[in-house]
Amino acid sequence: MVDENLYRIKKYSDDTAFSCISKHFITLKDEEIKANNQHLHNVVSQGLIPLMKEDTLFKDIYRNIKYEGSYFKGTKVAKPDEYDLNLSMKLPLNYNELQVETNHKHFSYVKIKVNSESKLPKWEEHSKILNKWLSDKNYLNQNKFHQWMEAIMTNTYKKLKKSDNFYELEVDGKNYRIKQFKKSGPAFTIFVELGDHPTLMSMDIVPCLELNDIILQGYKTFPDVSPSKCVVAKPISKEPEGEFLWRLSFYEQEKQILSNSEVSKLKVVVKMIKKLRDQLNYKPLASYYIETIFLHEIAKRKSDVDFFRASKTSLFIYMLQKLIQALEKKCIPYFWHEGHNLIGHLQPPVIENYANRLKNILLSIDKKIVDDRFAMAEFLLNEEEKKNLLEIVESSKTNGSDTQNLEKSEVIKKIKHVINDGKNKENQNSFATIVTHAIIDRKENDLERRIAFVCEELKNLGQMKEQIPLADLNKLSESFKIMFS
């Protein structure tokens, strides 16, 4: 049972380590984000979409690009080079006359029935193609829709100049090299290179159909969240009527929920849980499953401002417990319809292994965190990233941080020893304090907190007094004379 007030526990109130890990090993670089967003716009909006619009049906039903996935939700951990894009389309139909069926065993899917009364004049204009998408009972066939979109993609590629195994696309003076698209479920995956550089980015382009604000029986609604939703042509294996089942997407609503001014503070915690997942190589534990656990908690805590303003460390510990609890129950209910278990397809032994490993990690962090602020780094960072913690300190010479007078001392030398063998607990505690000291930003910490850190480090230095060379002791003495003269 998870303690619902765990986030109030004092020993988790210090965010020093959390902030360090987030800043240096999780936060995406602004320059990369800006550059890749421009490349994305060039390739898709300015390059491919105009060519697709040469097909008259596509031109008439295409609405816009919806940028999806964890990157655009603000919960992505890895390098910003993988993107999910929905090509949003709206069929020429009167949506008030559409029949959307949700009363079947696949809770995250719907069947769409197109009545003759719902067809608008534009439907008749394109009836030669559109009528082929309907079954004898007028259900919309997602497989035929997807085949049509594949033909659009193929014809678009034919309009590009081919060179070896690539297709060339020039936009705004930049020469992009695009590989032949690959089909992956509902997506068409494209790999893009710029000039002679290796793969710049990959994008999953997913065609989807808008459902507007149609109310779906049994599904959640939120008064402050847009009711607009869409469906994608995601196939279901071993299902007799699979070609008529469309997968629901509530991405826009989820993005809106996570963008709330208070709720958005949880995004970095989502990323930290994903970072742990990646470090443990738990690939079957999809990002969406983790985000869903957060969505449930957000809905439950929507009026609890204190929760969203709690320390990120305490929220990380709390949400990690929530994840463990869900894995122990072998169930992560779909946020929009809890009749669907997102991890129901995973093998029980796999889920049990994940839960047990995460419990051991949580116990270890909980045991050590009072004495070692960086206890979580042991599980969140790989060996290379752990070495980079040392570089944070050593770079103080050039970045002007508070450790610029300590980089030559014996304490800093002992940091290297701690990183190499991790055997000396006393030095580990000092290491945590030194790294903490190295990452403090003057603009983000008040005077009282800064003094507290200095006092703590002085206490550690006092315990090691006999090991500190006389020259370094003299440096400390001179520093205090200058400060208090």
Curated annotation (Swiss-Prot):
Indicate which residues the UniProt annotation says bind ATP.
70, 82-84, 271, 274
The prosthetic group or cofactor this protein requires is:
Mg(2+); Mn(2+)
Q: Which family does it belong to?
A: Belongs to the mab-21 family.
Reaction catalysis annotation? GTP + ATP = 2',3'-cGAMP + 2 diphosphate; GTP + ATP = pppGp(2'-5')A + diphosphate; pppGp(2'-5')A = 2',3'-cGAMP + diphosphate
Gene that encodes the chain: cGLR
Q: Which residues bind GTP?
A: 204, 247-254
Q: Where are the transmembrane segments?
A: none
The answer to whether the entry has keyword ATP-binding is: yes
Which top EC class applies here? transferase
* Manganese in keyword set: yes
Kindly list the positions annotated as binding Mg(2+): 82, 84, 204
Disulfide bridge map:
none
GO MF term (any one): 2',3'-cyclic GMP-AMP synthase activity
Stated name of the protein: Cyclic GMP-AMP synthase-like receptor
What role does it play? Nucleotidyltransferase that catalyzes the formation of cyclic GMP-AMP (2',3'-cGAMP) from ATP and GTP and plays a key role in innate immunity. Directly binds some unknown ligand, activating the nucleotidyltransferase activity, leading to synthesis of 2',3'-cGAMP, a second messenger that binds to and activates Sting, thereby triggering the immune response via activation of the NF-kappa-B transcription factor.
EC number, UniProt record: 2.7.7.86
Which residues does Mn(2+) bind? 298, 304
Q: Which domain of life is it from?
A: Eukaryota
Q: By its UniProt entry, which InterPro entries does this protein fall under?
A: Mab-21-like_nuc_Trfase, Mab-21_HhH/H2TH-like, MAB21L/cGLR
UniProt keywords (A-Z) are: ATP-binding, GTP-binding, Immunity, Innate immunity, Magnesium, Manganese, Metal-binding, Nucleotide-binding, Nucleotidyltransferase, Transferase
